């Protein structure tokens, strides 16, 4: 039981939701009435999101979601935060709850074999296993599993093309995929199986469940796990980390990254310095100055973030 004040719930569920548009307003009202912040995505294929609030408020929300006709029990990962990790509450209607951009991919019909965190090490240590990090390049940069391939994708939409271009690396192998909470692997494994690969596996509950359940001394995870909120990243035991965001490009930065000559708080980092013009950096510097002034006044410290 954590003594941190905010409970963070990452959830998803694939299920036919033809009535998804009508679910938006009740969810938004419940969240706002109970001080919950974060993002929930609704689509005809299900629900996905990460939210934070008091333990009691999150319990109410999960009960509401579970009671939605046709939805069933969502895949859930809980963690905790010392501060509210979101700025506002958003409930959005989408075409997909995780955007791959490939028509006809349905994890309810075909999906990879789930591997529990306690069994994951044995699978990825097998010399006949290819381990694929299903996340984006900036996520891979601060942490991944031993021996994992980085597809060097900036978005999930790029993954299908990577698979097609790298079939020879996957042929005749066990294919083990992982992502933050599991949802990207639902579609990724369904896609790969649709190409004719049979031995396709994914980490049940994702990295978050692995870091929660597998002791550090037994872990094959190196680094931190990027999360899409103001905590930026978590480590073993889902403890908050010292990774921060570059407010110019949203890349995660380790303490080592901040030693770069190209790092300036709120203005640039080594990853984005060459991508921005002097005018851009001047604009970011002015924004950062306003952030600092707001902090001194006790106003919202996330202005411009």
UniProtKB/Swiss-Prot annotation:
Regions crossing the membrane: none
Catalytic site positions: 179
Reaction it catalyzes: uridine(34) in tRNA + AH2 + O2 = 5-hydroxyuridine(34) in tRNA + A + H2O
Annotated EC: 1.14.-.-
Record's signal peptide: none
GO biological process: tRNA modification
UniProt-listed InterPro entries: Rhodanese-like_dom, Rhodanese-like_dom_sf, TrhO, TRHO_N
PANTHER family: RHODANESE-LIKE DOMAIN-CONTAINING PROTEIN 7-RELATED (PTHR43268:SF3), THIOSULFATE SULFURTRANSFERASE/RHODANESE-LIKE DOMAIN-CONTAINING PROTEIN 2 (PTHR43268)
Functional summary from the UniProt entry: Catalyzes oxygen-dependent 5-hydroxyuridine (ho5U) modification at position 34 in tRNAs.
Family: Belongs to the TrhO family.
Protein name: tRNA uridine(34) hydroxylase
């Amino acid at each position: 039981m954590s003594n941190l004040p905010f409970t963070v719930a990452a959830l998803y569920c694939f299920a036919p939701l033809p009535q998804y548009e009508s679910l938006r307003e009740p969810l938004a009202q419940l969240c706002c009435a109970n001080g919950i912040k974060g993002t929930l995505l609704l689509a005809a294929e299900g629900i996905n999101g990460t939210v934070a609030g008091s333990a009691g408020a999150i319990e109410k929300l999960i009960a509401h979601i579970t009671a939605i006709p046709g939805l069933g029990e969502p895949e859930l990962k809980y963690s905790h935060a010392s501060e509210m990790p979101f700025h506002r509450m958003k409930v959005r209607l989408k075409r997909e709850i995780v955007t791959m951009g490939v028509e006809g991919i349905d994890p309810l019909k075909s999906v990879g074999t789930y591997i529990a965190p306690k069994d994951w090490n044995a699978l990825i240590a097998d010399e006949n296993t290819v381990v694929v990090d299903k996340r984006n390049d900036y996520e891979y940069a601060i942490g991944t599993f031993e021996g994992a391939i980085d597809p060097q994708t900036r978005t999930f939409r790029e993954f299908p093309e990577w698979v097609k271009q790298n079939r020879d690396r996957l042929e005749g192998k066990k294919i083990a995929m992982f992502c933050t909470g599991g949802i990207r692997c639902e579609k990724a494994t369904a896609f790969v199986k649709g190409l004719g690969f049979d031995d396709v596996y994914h980490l049940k509950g994702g990295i978050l469940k692995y870091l929660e359940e597998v002791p550090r001394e037994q872990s094959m995870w190196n680094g931190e796990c990027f999360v899409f909120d103001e905590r930026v990243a978590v480590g073993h035991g889902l403890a908050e980390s010292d990774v921060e965001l570059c407010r110019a490009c949203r890349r995660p930065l380790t303490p080592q990254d901040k030693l770069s000559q190209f790092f300036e708080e709120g203005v640039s980092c080594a990853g984005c310095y060459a991508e921005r013009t002097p005018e851009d950096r001047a604009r970011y510097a002015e924004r950062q100055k306003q952030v600092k002034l707001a902090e001194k006044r006790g106003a919202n410290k996330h202005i411009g973030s």
